[in-house]
Amino acid sequence: MQKKEADPWYREEDESILEIYDIEQGTREVVREFDYLIEAPNWSMDGTCLFYNSNGRIFRLDLATKETSEIFSDFVTNCNNDHVLSPDGQSIAVSHGTKEDGKSRIYTLPLSGGVPRLITPMAPSYLHGWSPDGKTLAYCAERDGEYDIYTIPVEGGEERRLTYAEGLNDGPEYDPAGSEIWFNSVRTGLMQAWRMKSDGSEQTQMTCDEEWNTWFPHVSPDGKNVVMLSYRKGDLKPAEHLPHKHVELRLMPAAGGEVKTVVELFGGQGTINVNSWSPDSKKFAFVSYRIRGEN
């Protein structure tokens, strides 16, 4: 078995710390620690639970009791860290590596558990956004060797390509109004946050950091703020999104403006891949990591 020194993706010795950051108080709160890998929290629409993936499954954590329970997903047992809750809080869409070829495809299922429904037969497809009206999913997909952003009706059907720029375009997520999609793109050299209309028009660069590669811009429910994950330039290639890095969570106004660091942590992949804002827009959840046996 490869150890972490030889394989940057070796994570069997990861321990996970599920945390919440309060943007008004500027404080971090540890929700619960795990002696294994968990990733990518989503905050429930009623504010009572967090949902995360671990070992290919989706779990619910009750914020009052800190108890966890697995969401029954039948044959979908290889979920990655790209999953999103529906706007009505009744369903979850997940990205699952199918047994046939191991490639990620998007499925939806009841949040209470149930038999998943395949949405994207074409693969790989990695989910990131669900439109506020509940009708459309947005995702990153590799087609003919290019990773771009696509949308598809939530019931399935014909997918629509929104980006054509060379290089990785990833992490599409709707703003609360549903009129715009935030995403990250490497098209200008480093990974940066971008915004476009929901039909793919008016693609606009929102960060112009010369020292950072910025991933996964998540818009708060009130539409005022965006939290992003940033790697320092030189720590990896611009299109890489690795674990086991010293990274920063950074906040900026959704209208554009100064970007400020609010959290420094050890993590990266799995820390905040999907939207994790609380319904009141005052907090967001994330995962930091440590390697077992290391301080």
What does each model-found stretch correspond to?
Residues 1-295:
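Sequence signature of WD/YWTD-type beta-propeller architectures
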